[in-house]
């Protein structure tokens, strides 16, 4: 990946699958001994192509794991939801563990995705821990599941691999806005005022581009005398976005060394990852809005320069010339892990690591005096943002393995300490010299206005943990796993610093029983588990009281006037005051998630058909939420508390199947797929509606779109039901039949969360040719097309703004008709996507006279996002699931979302 790794699909069907090594919390186990729900994907089965995020490698591959793109921007985040959404404000993303190092989800890194620093070409495998038995050993950060990323290590004879690829990306489909001729007719037809500059401009063509992607990865690996092994790599990626002025560059380096001494009793792992990421972004919201609403009769250019708009606003082509948003992130993740065998079966291990990330982000407008309708752009602006973050981890573990005849017992005990420090400094400047020098390179102390705003913040969080695990197996038939973790976090109050997270799991390898000797099952294992995990992804310091100093600035009613006398006009009348901005809550507790899982693993037809079936029930309780005080005399408007009775429930089924053909012959194949059904709802909520999504824009700001509603699905859309247009005005359902349509006539009309998540794949080998296909999809979800509501009302068409047919679908609709939040803008979000297809050809070096130079030569062609089957009218049904409303996760709202690209790549892989 990210340079198109060699396709090497293993099709040998035998019991080796049971001996497959799976990464679990603080260790490894054979697949046959696993009692929890763990899904694994090796590097040879990753999705191919331009990949910025490890989540993209897995999309469509795993049951129970919904992976969606927040947007199509290069480096955009991936929302990874494991077994349903289980929290409101305290984080919905899994814990990421990279080579044993626990990442901090709150460290954002580059302006988009905190995992951009990892080169996907360096990853050997990804294991997803789904049930509480597998995740409870990680305690307070495991309620949303755990994603364990293991990078490549060296083995065998020395080898050099060079992977090169290049390709192009483009906008798959344009929104069907009017061309100039149709636009002229439609503006007149609705009785509007036509502004006609005699042009014929397709603004979607003007503001998008065919982006070029270039990738290069060089790696070296090997081992010597079973005492020393190494893997070293360098990577380069340069990816243009499909919007102009959109680009991601990443320079990466990786070094993994394993050294053994004392006759193999001492083993030391060194891991080093270094990266530099440069992320260039356009003014996305403005660009998306302009390219679908700008008057098509306005020529893009006049006399070689972007045409001045009649509104005195910025021509978006001019905006691209003077606007720049560049974030540069430098990151180093380094760890050392020595382990020493103290006695037979007894091993001590130290894991020490540091993750340092520093981001500099400059958002600037060069001065452009001709603009009068866009704030301070005419003078030039600069926002300079500095975000250094440090994550230090020290872990000590002691493990013991004991075996006697049919009994096998393994103990693990450990202590972990993690120190997380996040800083942020933002400075805003206004007024720059209008010359060829960018504002960020000018002397800010000489600007017309010194820093107009400055903000500085720093937080430190500490986490101390004690954990243990016991694994017992009898005769390779009966398996028991028990784990326990105690986490103490500085985020919580003095009365509840520690949370306690136990789990237990049972397994039965039925095929090892005597009565199964002649069974058609090659493998049959039954699993059951129950456990409790936690969630501490909440803002820092919220258990502590905070205060604000208020002082008189200028004049009566000044914003900074001490509130006891808002009419004060002199400095000697209440000049200073201290007020509460947050109440202390030393009783704030951990949010917890309890999960029950029943599973079956099976294999048939000499291990050619393998599969898993799981039922799970996940209940999140003790919900953490910022609430309004019950006492109206409280000195603050909100404070953080646990909602004792409220629960979020996710129940579901998972099915995953994989089939390998007979490995004999020149043609072989592998097909597989997975499907997940999830039923979720909010239970015993004391609130009528907890808003997760609210409208934005003129006349609609704050109007509820979706939220958490008692006994309804998560992300339930709550709005008026649109029936049509009568006498020029929208008609809505009178739900309670009282003859009036008011707020209480709003109803739940669907959910943004899909009921079914599915994916399927196929790999075909014929002689030296290989073809791989990967599909993914969702069903049962809705999308609110906020773009339609904001940009395509008939009234805006009448003002010479472009629209689609959506604006004129009701000819008798008046220009004064309000476009309120309703099912008029709610659409089916179901889709099926061919997200990846790769055709590869392996050249046998010996047959072309290159056997002495190369071990392998492979050419490949890859397509990404090749087609989408959907009824959704927007750019793409995967929308901005990464946004928040008041700190609560928002789902299923499409508002000016950056479109996903369609990409084609050619690649060359050389192994020396």
Language-model segments: residues:
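Short, small/polar-rich motifs associated with maturation and membrane association
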Residues: 1-273, 333-334, 546, 590-591, ...
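Flexible loop and strand-edge segments within Gram-negative outer membrane beta-barrel domains
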Residues: 171-173, 197, 201-203, 207, ...
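Small-side-chain secondary-structure face that scaffolds active or pore-lining regions
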Residues: 222-224, 240-252, 265-287, 330, ...
